[in-house]
Curated annotation (Swiss-Prot):
It is found in: Cytoplasm, Nucleoid. HAMAP family: MraZ (MF_01008). CDD domains: MraZ_C, MraZ_N. One of its GO terms (cellular component) is nucleoid. Keywords: Cytoplasm, DNA-binding, Repeat, Transcription, Transcription regulation. This is Transcriptional regulator MraZ. Coiled coil: none annotated. Belongs to the MraZ family. It comes from Ruegeria pomeroyi (strain ATCC 700808 / DSM 15171 / DSS-3). Forms oligomers. GO terms for molecular function: DNA-binding transcription factor activity; transcription cis-regulatory region binding.
Length: 167
């Protein structure tokens, strides 16, 4: 199994859209790029297509290859395949980490998520997300708190994993 992204952090965004990626995230990007060599710059794909999402979803090369294989398995001509190709192929931005561990986010991507001078990075297993910190606080933290408030005080999150399969 591939390494997973873990953790969260805030990073400054400069006027050119450059933002440092958490060091632990860079290690996962390196491990998930079959063409990466020591001293090189790992590649990744940023998907921004779903207009309802207020974040950028960042995939390692291995993770996006898995998505591509699933899309390729859909029937040719199906609406699902067409829309997923548009979202994951057309509305995505292939890029690489620069020599100093930064991403350069184009204005189009920054505008989509209303990103200005600070970015919030949060791990999502085989991907990571980039958010405007205020948007994340308003939407995701509120949803998590609401969900937890509906559960009993002695709730154990591991109970959801019992019988989930895997190894």
């Amino acid at each position: 199994m591939a390494r997973r992204f873990r953790g969260e952090s805030n990073h400054k965004v400069d006027s050119k859209g450059r933002v440092s990626i958490p060091a632990s995230f860079r290690r996962v990007l390196e491990a998930g790029d079959p063409n990466w060599q020591s001293g090189g710059n790992p590649e990744l794909v940023i998907v921004y297509g779903d207009h309802r999402r207020k974040f950028l979803e960042c995939y390692t090369m291995e993770a996006i290859d898995e998505v591509d294989a699933k899309i390729d398995a859909l029937p040719r001509g199906s609406m699902e395949r067409k829309m997923l190709q548009r979202m994951f192929h057309g509305q995505s931005f292939p890029t690489s980490v620069d020599e100093t561990g930064r991403l350069v986010l184009p204005a189009k991507l920054r505008t989509k998520i209303a990103l200005e001078d600070e970015a919030f990075f949060i791990a999502a297993g085989d991907t990571f997300q980039i958010w405007n910190p205020a948007t994340y606080d308003q939407e995701e933290l509120a949803a998590a708190e609401e969900w937890l408030d509906e559960l009993p005080e002695d709730f154990d999150p591991m109970q959801y994993l019992d019988g989930a399969g895997g190894s």
